[in-house]
A protein has these predicted regions:
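A short beta-sheet element
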Residues: 33-34, 49-115
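Short, basic/aromatic beta-hairpin or loop at an interaction surface
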Residues: 38-51
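Acidic/polar loop patches that form or flank catalytic/metal-binding clefts of enzymes
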Residues: 18
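Non-catalytic DNA-recognition/assembly elements of restriction-modification systems
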Residues: 1-15, 31
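Short alpha-helical functional segments enriched in proximate histidine and acidic residues
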Residues: 15, 118-119
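Short, intrinsically disordered, charge-balanced linker/junction segments flanking boundaries
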Residues: 120-125
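Short acidic/glycine-enriched loop/turn segments that link adjacent beta-strands
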Residues: 26-28, 90-91
Length: 125
């Protein structure tokens, strides 16, 4: 049986609060960037180099994604994949994939891992 990704998962974009407003930073909400993924290179990720505050969260269009969401970098570097170990947010360099009941997050992680070269090839035009 074949499915389109949007039939079995919800795809979420991230966002970045203004970096010039100090009230938005050093809070309790985990916020992940592609750089964080490149530094950790692990199957699971729980936090990055910076956290945002509730004000920072409210100021932009980032979304708090649930535990077990697949995080896929969609901007340089493209193709880093991890699974959220807890609720967290990402910047705009991600497509976060919240799996539905038709697919297990770990399966999605491994399946996407086999598609990295393809994702890179289509991202370069």
């Amino acid at each position: 049986m074949k499915y389109k990704l949007k039939q079995i998962a919800e795809i979420i974009n991230g966002s970045t609060p203004s970096t010039s407003n100090s009230e938005y930073w050093d809070g309790d909400i985990s916020w992940i960037t592609p750089k964080d993924m490149s530094l950790q290179m692990k199957r699971y990720i729980s936090n990055g180099g910076r956290n945002i505050t509730q004000k920072g969260y409210d100021s932009c269009s980032t979304t708090l994604v649930p535990k077990d969401t697949i995080l896929l970098t969609s901007r340089a570097p493209i193709g880093y994949i991890s699974i959220a170990q807890n609720e967290l947010c990402t910047n705009q360099g991600f497509k976060s994939i919240i799996c539905g009941d038709k697919v297990l997050p770990l399966f999605m992680y491994y399946w996407l891992s086999t598609k990295v070269d393809f994702l890179k090839s289509i991202s370069n035009g």
